[in-house]
Regions:
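Sec-type signal peptide cleavage vicinity
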Residues: 23, 34-36
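S-adenosyl-L-methionine
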Residues: 1-14, 38, 42, 48-301
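Conserved beta strand-loop-helix elements of the APE1-like EEP
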Residues: 11-26
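Short, charged, solvent-exposed linker or helix-capping segments at domain edges/interfaces
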Residues: 27-32, 265-266
């Protein structure tokens, strides 16, 4: 609701919540539907008012906030890698100057998926000691020693400072869940449009990507459906005006439909087509981004 919007007033917005402990009492939920400036001290506001039971998330209707995690969805979703040092990120040209067999992977963050990929790579020395890195990959060792260690030397966390050649978080759960998969599903944690896509298993995901250890296009189709998107908007959170995909409340609580084999096959086929079509169009038109694609789609709808 707008604060006083005059010359001597504060140009801010506030949210006020007043309640009392009574599980059976009817609450009132008023939502701003329109604002108009008629030259007075503030804005004239139109409200849409509903009366009913208010849940913990200050919403009425289905109590989405009370949904619990489903056992079937456990151990599947994880955040991407938290590297803790820009020195691990290198260009293809820089990678070419290091050992050909060094553990270097293609790297994608949220902007790479929604915008145009930077084409960068990531040094990932997980599972190796510093001595093993120095003996097997001396050039890579020197690169990380010069570009990561100086910053890590000032880190207050002993484990991060002492294991300077490794990423800040090892993400062992993520690595174990993706092991053996040819591809996995990823979505950007905070994004204007909720888009799910397949990433090749060779691609290292950034911490701002939510990764699902599933390679079945039937799952991709369900997650891309309007039903799941509606669930995400109700169960997730927001950052400014952008929805945030919280894996614990958006994925782990989501009840997948009990589809028949024929329905699964149809959804699987459509999802493969969708994923391939988007990637094909972006390959044919390098300036085309997923955000731009879905902005146009939103206008058409």
């Amino acid at each position: 609701h707008p604060w006083v919007d005059s010359a001597d007033g504060a140009a801010v917005r506030i949210a006020m919540t007043v309640g009392r402990a009574d599980n059976n009492a009817a609450g009132t939920l008023s939502t701003v539907t329109a604002e108009a400036d008629h030259g007075g001290e503030g804005l004239e506001v139109e409200l849409d008012t509903r009366v009913g039971l208010l849940h913990a998330d200050l919403r009425m209707g289905a109590n989405v906030a009370a949904a619990g995690a489903l056992r079937a969805n456990g151990g599947i979703s994880n955040r991407g890698l938290e590297i803790g040092g820009a020195g691990f990120i290198i260009t293809p040209e820089e990678a070419a100057r290091l050992e050909a067999d060094a553990p270097i992977k293609d790297y994608r963050n949220g902007k790479d998926l929604t915008d145009r990929p930077r084409g960068v790579k990531l040094i990932d020395l997980f599972g190796l000691t510093a001595e093993e890195v120095r003996s097997r990959y001396p050039a890579t060792y020197q690169w990380v020693y010069e570009r990561v260690k100086p910053e890590r030397d000032h880190n207050r966390m002993d484990s991060v400072r002492e294991n300077w050649w490794l990423h800040r978080r090892l993400r062992e759960d993520l690595r174990a869940s993706l092991a053996g998969l040819p591809r996995y599903i990823a979505t950007v944690e905070t994004a204007k449009h909720r888009v799910f896509q397949f990433l090749d298993a060779s691609i290292a995901p950034d911490n701002k990507l939510i990764c699902l250890a599933l390679d079945d296009a039937w799952v991709l189709g369900v997650l891309s459906s309007s039903v799941h998107v509606a669930w995400v908007l109700a169960a997730g959170s927001t950052l400014e005006d952008r929805p945030v995909y919280v894996k614990t409340t958006c994925f782990e609580t989501f009840p997948f439909p009990a589809a028949t084999p024929d329905q699964q096959a149809r959804i699987r086929d459509l999802a493969e087509q969708l994923d391939a079509h988007r990637k094909r169009q972006q390959a044919a038109h390098p300036a085309l981004t997923l955000t731009g694609m879905y902005n146009v789609l939103a206008k058409i709808r």
